[in-house]
A protein has these predicted regions:
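Juxtamembrane transmembrane-helix termini in multi-pass membrane transport proteins
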Residues: 2-74, 164-183
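C-terminal functional regions that serve as terminal interaction/effector modules
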Residues: 213-223
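Small-residue-enriched transmembrane helix starts and helix-helix packing motifs
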Residues: 1-21, 114-154, 177-179, 183
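Membrane helix-loop-helix hairpins that form the core translocation module of multi-pass transporters
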Residues: 39-122, 195, 211-214
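Hydrophobic/aromatic residues within the transmembrane alpha-helices of Major Facilitator Superfamily
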Residues: 13, 17-21, 50-51, 85, ...
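Transmembrane alpha-helical segments of integral membrane proteins
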Residues: 56, 186-198
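Juxtamembrane boundary at the C-terminal end of a transmembrane helix
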Residues: 222-230
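Alpha-helical transmembrane segments and their helix-helix packing motifs
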Residues: 8-11, 66, 77-78, 132, ...
């Protein structure tokens, strides 16, 4: 394993862990795991995060081939400084950890009630048809797995962790970024699913945000001081 892969892996792992712990998708995974089978929630959430990491790394890898590498390097540097200041601002803001956890829980409760209301409108014939198809469909497309996947995927889309992964892949070895990102996502998601709401409620989102902001600023400074070939 080359030094560039190790550097990309280390940066991606640290960034992912500090970005995802206490994130909305972290809380969502913890709450879903309390209401549904953990293995399905873990598979759905982790599957979405792996797909998102790979897609983000591909975009970052392709960027230097479409835009001069010097420009992508400068853009990445600005992103790191911007995300660092943004994350620090979030960490020092007045919003409490319980507020975000309650917000995610309320959103999931609302979605569950909507789904239940739609289900009661189905006819008996539809129920019989669903029962006949259930063994095959459930083995491939579990509703719980799909729910966990969609909530996580769309929750992460456009998030600063996704944009930071794109920036890292543009500036570092993309293979290392993917490996570090996937390992970080696996660690955070597994902790959320196994720890449940009790773990999520005991995490100091403020301290995690401050640590993440400092890390982004360190990455930005390192990128600013480094040189890149045109």
């Amino acid at each position: 394993m080359t030094s560039s892969v190790i550097q990309g892996f280390t940066k991606s792992l640290a960034m992912t862990v500090l970005s995802e712990i206490g994130d909305k998708t972290f809380f969502a995974a913890a709450i879903l795991a309390m209401r549904h089978p953990r293995r399905l929630v873990l598979a759905g959430c982790l599957g979405a995060l792996i797909v998102m990491t790979i897609l983000s790394a591909l975009v970052g890898w392709a960027a230097p081939n479409l835009i001069p590498r010097v420009w992508t390097h400068h853009i990445t540097t600005i992103l790191f400084f911007g995300f660092g200041l943004w994350t620090l601002w979030e960490g020092f803001s007045d919003k409490g950890d319980e507020d975000e956890l309650a917000e995610v829980e309320a959103k999931l409760d609302s979605d569950m009630k909507t789904t239940a209301a739609k289900a009661t409108k189905g006819s008996k014939g539809d129920d019989d048809l669903k029962k006949q198809k259930r063994p095959f469909l459930t083995s491939l497309f579990s509703p719980i797995l799909l729910k966990a996947f969609s909530i996580t995927f769309f929750g992460e889309w456009g998030d600063k962790s996704q944009l930071a992964t794109i920036g890292l892949a543009a500036d570092e070895n993309p293979y290392g970024v993917v490996l570090g990102g996937i390992l970080g996502q696996a660690l955070c998601t597994t902790a959320a699913v196994l720890g449940g709401k009790s773990l999520a409620s005991n995490i100091s989102e403020k301290m995690v945000a401050i640590s993440g902001g400092i890390l982004f600023l360190i990455f930005g400074m390192q990128s600013f001081l480094s040189t890149v070939e045109p």
